[in-house]
């Protein structure tokens, strides 16, 4: 599903980004509050709890554990550097790391955006992840919703595309990333779908968010474009 959306945007993009909103919610309340595992986690290889909940190891909570995936998706589809960030982070249930995030971004090209992350209750939506990316550019807009298996594109010339996707098209394949890495190493893929540049954009966006939450003010990137 994501690759189909990426290929559509490569064929016809939405122009200069003006606004982007990213929303994610997953069942991490127990995990990040030291009260239980992540649903669907392997029972054979259980990581130490502090892998997730000791900030010295994890660097944070929901942002590091989950929003890294959301940002990776967003910047894969619409690459853009973050110039400024302002973030609120919440740690209910006496959690040692944050369970919820509300972040505002200003991108290097002047566009603005929001990133929202929430630790859902176990059992909600049958533990199905929620992840949505919406972007508006000067030549069109798109909405990618993995939870509802929806991919919609609209362009100023009147073109409208509503992709037909099978059930569970947005489901996570736990082995896909590892298999893709092996394929890249073997030369079996024409392109690396997770290049270093994508990782750098994601890390920079998260780093600024955590800086802002810690300082209580806008964090500004010191890296020149």
Identify the function of each model-found stretch.
Residues 124-129, 153-164:
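A short, polar/proline- and glycine-enriched secondary-structure boundary/capping micro-motif
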Residues 1, 16, 66, 99, ...:
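An acidic site on a long C-lobe helix of protein kinase domains
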Residues 70, 143-147, 160-225:
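C-terminal helical cap and adjacent loop that interface with cofactors, partners, or active-site loops
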Residues 22-24, 117, 165, 223:
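Active-site donor-binding loop signature of nucleotide-sugar glycosyltransferases
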Residues 65, 69-149, 176-189, 222-225:
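Contiguous beta-strand/loop segments that form the cofactor/metal-binding neighborhood of enzyme cores
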Residues 1-93, 216:
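Predominantly a Rossmann-like dinucleotide-binding segment in NAD(P)-dependent oxidoreductases
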């Amino acid at each position: 599903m994501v690759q189909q959306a990426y290929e559509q945007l490569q064929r016809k993009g939405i122009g200069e980004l003006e606004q982007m909103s990213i929303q994610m919610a997953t069942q991490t309340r127990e995990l990040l509050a030291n009260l239980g595992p992540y649903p669907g986690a392997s029972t054979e290889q259980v990581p130490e709890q502090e892998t997730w909940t000791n900030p010295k190891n994890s660097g944070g909570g929901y942002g590091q554990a989950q929003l890294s995936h959301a940002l990776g998706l967003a910047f894969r589809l619409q690459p853009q550097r973050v110039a400024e960030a302002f973030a609120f982070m919440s740690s209910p249930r006496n959690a040692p790391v944050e369970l919820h995030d509300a972040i505002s971004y200003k991108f290097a090209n002047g566009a603005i955006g929001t990133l929202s992350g929430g630790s859902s209750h176990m059992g909600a939506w049958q533990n199905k992840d929620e992840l949505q990316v919406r972007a508006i550019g000067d030549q069109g807009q798109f909405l990618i919703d993995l939870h509802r298996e929806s991919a919609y594109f609209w362009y100023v010339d009147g073109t409208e595309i509503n992709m037909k996707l099978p059930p569970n098209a947005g489901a996570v394949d736990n082995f896909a990333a590892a298999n893709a890495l092996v394929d890249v190493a073997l030369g079996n893929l024409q392109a690396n779908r997770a290049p270093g540049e994508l990782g750098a954009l994601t890390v920079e966006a998260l780093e600024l968010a955590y800086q802002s939450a810690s300082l209580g003010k806008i964090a500004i990137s010191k890296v020149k474009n």
